[in-house]
Design a protein with these regions (language model features):
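FAD-site-proximal beta/loop scaffold in flavoenzymes
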Residues: 152-169, 254-330, 416, 431
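Flexible, glycine-rich terminal cap/loop adjacent to redox cofactors
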Residues: 7-35, 47, 51-58, 346-357, ...
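Short glycine/serine/threonine-rich phosphate/pyrophosphate-binding segments
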Residues: 14-18, 40, 156, 181-184, ...
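Glycine-rich dinucleotide-binding loop and its adjacent helix/turn
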Residues: 46, 139-194, 198, 226-227, ...
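Beta1/beta-strand and adjacent pyrophosphate-binding region of the FAD-binding site
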Residues: 1-12, 168-175
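Short hydrophobic core segments
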Residues: 9, 114, 130-140, 174-175, ...
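Glycine-rich flavin
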Residues: 2-4, 20-27, 32-168, 201-205, ...
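A Rossmann-like FAD-binding core segment of flavoenzymes
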Residues: 72, 108-111, 115-124, 192-292, ...
Length: 471
């Protein structure tokens, strides 16, 4: 039997963050991973999807250079795109997530599945037992399965399995209009696939304000994606080709497709861990029950990342892993600041958000002021032919309640507002540092300065000060 201070189950973002931090503090840590070190983010999520999106955008742009007087004919080599994706994965794995790198950092890595035998012991698939003082479960999540009568599994791909496609689909039907479905759908459309997205509700990205939904819908249509709202697959026919009877609203049409992407959410991975043996309460659909420090109902065990339920973000999983680790070791009062959690959708246009939406503030009857910066006021955006909009919701003291950015670099820029919110500062703080011109950061600084100046000049103070100084 081997003894450890910290045992971590799962080598995705949450587990790796916790294990690395534990090793830096000098405690004895073991990391278990039954599949691949790096988790979904590295192999089937963030890294491959963003590599695909980058390739798709570049290829799409190369076909649309008429405004510069360039006429080009582009021939796609899908295998080259796949090579680019796998190269990105390999590079990140080798310098960041390999077993060698982790062991050099002082982490013992066990590439086996484990189960709880009691509240302080784990048993590996090979029969080895490990005791721990604290355990952090970071077992991740899996794509929900699509079950439609007549639709064979060989025709279905998920965000996990779509990367094994050897050729570009002629027609990809996507069930689910969330971020994953929209990002992948638009990327495949830019590469040349015919893409149809089926969203069961009457609005895309329902959590967000109508303006976001409309902007994304417009961008999808411009890149060739056919979005059907209030839509579902009613019938499946398998003849010489796959035929889908799709109902959208009160209209039903037959579509021919070669692949169906199931993008209908994710389910926490809780089975096979022996959670019952450690008296850990969980729900197969919602995940492992935790408190605000991510402690489970077994006081020495924590659950972080996807296994405790959404939101399913890599950056959030990492933050939870660190929070659980420092609480387990030091009893830290550190908590995740949910109000300053940024969301980014890597569609074209890119969308980023932090804090409350306007509809949420309206429904809660909370007062706010709206400040808007359009991209046609940003010199860099004008030079690069980018359209977009920054919307900031402020309280009376100019503290940020929420911010939404639609347009180029939205994901990079939202970090400014997330930091200000997380630090409890005013928008004014963004006006303090000098930014280089011409950059988007400079535009955000100038906008914050304008808001601050407007608020100041609307008071009686400037007039009194000027009069006292003889003006």
């Amino acid at each position: 039997m081997k003894k450890y201070d910290i045992a971590v189950i799962g080598a995705g973002s949450a587990g790796l963050t916790a294990a690395r931090l534990a090793a830096k503090f000098g405690v004895n840590v073991v990391l278990f991973e039954k599949h691949r070190i790096g988790g979904d983010c590295l192999y089937t999520g963030c890294v491959p999807s963003k590599s695909l999106i980058t390739a798709a955008r570049d290829i799409y742009k190369s076909q649309n250079l008429q405004k510069y007087g360039v006429k080009a004919t582009v021939k796609l080599d899908f295998q080259a795109v796949r090579n680019h994706i796998h190269s990105s994965i390999h590079h990140i794995r080798e310098h960041d997530d390999s077993r060698k790198v982790l062991e050099e950092a002082g982490i013992e890595v066990v590439e086996e599945s484990v189960t709880f035998t009691n509240k302080s012991t784990l048993r590996s698939a090979s029969g080895e037992e490990y005791t721990f003082k604290k355990c952090i479960i970071a077992s991740g999540s899996s794509p929900n399965k699509l079950n439609i009568d007549g639709l064979k599994q060989e025709h279905i791909v998920t965000s996990d399995t779509i990367w094994s496609l050897n050729k570009l689909p002629k027609h990809l039907v996507i069930v689910g209009g969330g971020p994953i479905g929209l990002e992948l759908g638009q990327a495949f459309a830019m590469l040349g696939s015919r893409v149809t997205v089926l969203e069961r509700s009457d609005k895309l990205l329902g959590r967000f304000d109508q303006e976001v939904s409309e902007a994304v819908m417009k961008g999808l249509k411009e890149s060739g994606v056919n979005v059907l709202l209030n839509a579902s697959i009613e019938e499946v026919r398998e003849e010489t080709e796959l035929k889908l009877s799709i109902k959208a609203g009160d209209k039903t049409e037959m579509y021919v497709a070669d692949k169906v992407l199931a993008a209908i959410g994710r389910t926490p991975n809780t089975s096979g861990l022996g959670l019952e043996q450690a008296d850990i309460v969980f729900d197969e659909r919602k995940g492992i029950e935790v408190d605000d420090k991510f402690r489970t109902t077994s006081k020495n065990t924590y659950a972080v990342g996807d296994c405790k339920g959404g939101p399913y973000f890599t950056h959030l999983a990492g933050e939870q892993g660190a929070t659980a680790l420092v609480h387990g070791l030091f009893g830290s009062k550190r908590k995740v600041n949910w109000s300053a959690l940024p969301w980014v959708f890597f569609t074209t246009p890119e969308v980023a958000h932090v804090g409350a939406s306007e509809s949420e503030l309206l429904s809660s009857n909370r007062g706010y002021e709206t400040e808007i910066l359009n991209y046609d006021q940003i010199d860099k955006a004008i030079a690069e032919h980018h359209e977009g909009k920054v919307t900031i919701l402020l309280d009376k003291k100019r503290k940020i309640l929420g911010a939404t950015i639609i347009g180029e670099n939205a994901g990079e820029l939202i970090g400014y507002y997330a930091y200000i919110m997380g630090a409890g500062k005013k928008l004014d703080s963004l006006a303090q540092p000098i930014q280089a011109y011409p950059t988007y950061a400079m535009a955000l600084r100038q906008h914050a300065s304008n808001v601050q100046t407007k608020a100041f000049t609307n008071t009686f103070i400037p007039k009194i000060l000027l009069k006292l100084r003889g003006y």
